[in-house]
């Protein structure tokens, strides 16, 4: 907990407190860091570019609008997952960071997630999707230019608004009719990247179950695509293997108070024990649309993964061993209505008597 600097343990009834203390002591003890291995990308840059072009072709043929493709880095892990989490939290603090260890499953998850899947409190359900990312600049002037470029990017804004519409639709299935609104639009600045972030929220409908709310939003639209079912089919075909923890969710649910808060597991390290060795896996990617540039998509995946690979193995996710720029965190509110700036990309369309109906099966219809 950020305010109390404490960690809550979630367990089962009738478990001895001494067992919990023993477990916590073993796992939270500070281990001496050892010389790490270097992560290996499971696919080459050229393979990543090829798969990006495959997705673009699927979009041009009308099968899908957007697909979030992920690439994997993998290597043995000499340090325990808690040490990695501690280092990552210092180097790349994030609002929805989380850590989990299951000895029986031989599995640990370390995450510095900046993204919220859902929050339910006082009868209001909220989701805060991220879509649109740029690396930080090397100085304040370049950093401001990066933000300006992101705000004016037609591609990023189009992707983001498509996602906002998708989340509004998904929330509508568990909210009171007419209560779902796009309530906030902002730039969230993290140590290594700037993100375009929105908040979509609504009043939970009478009789709606928490499980229904989770089902309506999971998996998040930002890490699948649109429409979801077709996007996930393409992802399954091109990625070829399970994502593991990446793009899953971790958080807390209080059945007594009805409060829930769940993240989306991006910027995440997945650790599995195989043959008595810890094997770490990191995935990163981005949303592919019709005008995506394959080489740019490859670079985006690499600098998204970079903070995790450096904290885990002390090595970059890309060939050039250059330290990416870092800066202070912050939030910049963005306008949610048409702007007087002629160069801005927010356009108010005139009302017309004709409409086009597009049925996207499992996502949204407009």
Model-derived regions, located:
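Phosphate-coordination loops involved in phosphoryl transfer and adenosine-cofactor binding
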Residues: 352
